[in-house]
Amino acid sequence: MNQIHKILIANRAEIAVRVIRACRDLHIKSVAVFTEPDRECLHVKIADEAYRIGTDAIRGYLDVARIVEIAKACGADAIHPGYGFLSENYEFAKACEDAGIIFIGPKSEVIHKMGNKNIARKLMAKNGIPIVPGTEKLNSYSMEEIKIFAEKIGYPVILKASGGGGGRGIRVVHKEQDLENAFESCKREALTYFNNDEVFMEKYVVNPRHIEFQILGDNYGNIIHLCERDCSIQRRHQKVIEIAPCPGISDNLRKTMGVTAVAAAKAVGYTNAGTIEFLLDDYNRFYFMEMNTRIQVEHPITEEITGIDLIIRQIRIAAGEILDLEQSDIKPRGFAIEARITAENVWKNFIPSPGKIGEYYPALGPSVRVDSHIYKDYTVPPYYDSMLAKLIIKATSYDLAVNKLERALKEFVIDDIRTTIPFLIAITKTREFRRGYLDTSFIETHMQELLEKTEDRHQENKEEVIAAIAATLKKIRESRE
């Protein structure tokens, strides 16, 4: 087993803070990196060492050569990529491997295979994992041929960037006349965000549940899952609330999906922490969607129901430790819910709301956890993802977990900037959420009700906003008919 004495965290904000705390628990030195706008971010303040990687807000976090250079210069044994930025960049993992630095994640070739959704689909189908009916990459085909593919699959269809993720590079098409514009738009976005304009097509599963299984595998072929998470509460393909385990699915279905998730991970020779994502339709048919070859934003709810620290497990597996858990050891207890609190203005179509935080009082109490990087007087920069904090609740039942979530959100104070806290409270008040009736259309379907229940602390013209959004939603529905 390799000894890890110092870890560089190639990331920022909340996930960097999370990894630094795991390092402290293991008595491992932590190294933060930052760009100039992040100089006052919490991860920089609490790390044992911190190094600036540039003045540009984003570019430094994507500079493979510079990050590896700093890791070597400071004597880091390993690099943890977090999520986002370079976390699923196989060239970064390969650069670490070539430099003799432990990459805390899967091997570079696995990241490469699973990072291309088209390749991943083929691999899963070859190994008997159910996939959504669809095509290979479409870029070499004419538009007339693409229209024929769509007709054979049947509308609605969804166009996806092969190298995509995070809700980018996705277009849902309900009728043929919209296909060409959607295809060109999807290609442009894919090229901008992923430097790869490959696009493929799938049958669009209408209003599915988005269910993912947490995978953990060591370097010796031992792979298990740590139960599932329901990530169906989304807005524009971005997760808003996650729940573990999934309310309202049978034990038999849960077992079948879990076995399939492990088989999918074994098919690619997976190591470390990862996630197999499925779509579940109204008939309990499930389909492989993608694999995330990194730690997930929502990993804390799995930790809460299993008692397993995933970041510590990542580090130990990367150091060569044998996984001392079997599938029969994993027995979830209770329910956990995570709500992502973001700096967004609900009343202006969720535009980012950066600025200086005034009073800051995170929620407290039994079985309440907050993972965050913010503090009183911290200035939220405009350059990054708008997430401020993750509020994680644990309870013995789903009903009690929802009650606790509502209470904790009401106690959570972040002053002087707009946040989604009131909107999240509104979600907890809906009958469908409380009953566990969840699917990916939840927020869109209930948007008018949610806005009516959202407390407007800044006293904007709420009625006009709701009316405008209702009219927009009506137009969207009519365009699909």
Please tell me what each predicted stretch does.
Residues 134-135:
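Conserved beta3 strand of the protein kinase N-lobe
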Residues 2-26, 30, 50-51, 72-74, ...:
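ATP-dependent carboxylate activation and anion-phosphoryl transfer catalytic cores
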Residues 171:
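Glycine/aspartate-rich loop-and-adjacent alpha/beta segment that forms the canonical ThDP
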Residues 1-126, 139-148, 464, 469-480:
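ATP-binding N-terminal substructure of ATP-dependent carboxylate-amine bond-forming enzymes
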Residues 148-158:
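Acidic/histidine-enriched active-site and ligand-binding environments that engage anionic O-linkages
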Residues 161:
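N-terminal nucleotide-binding beta1-loop-alpha1 segment
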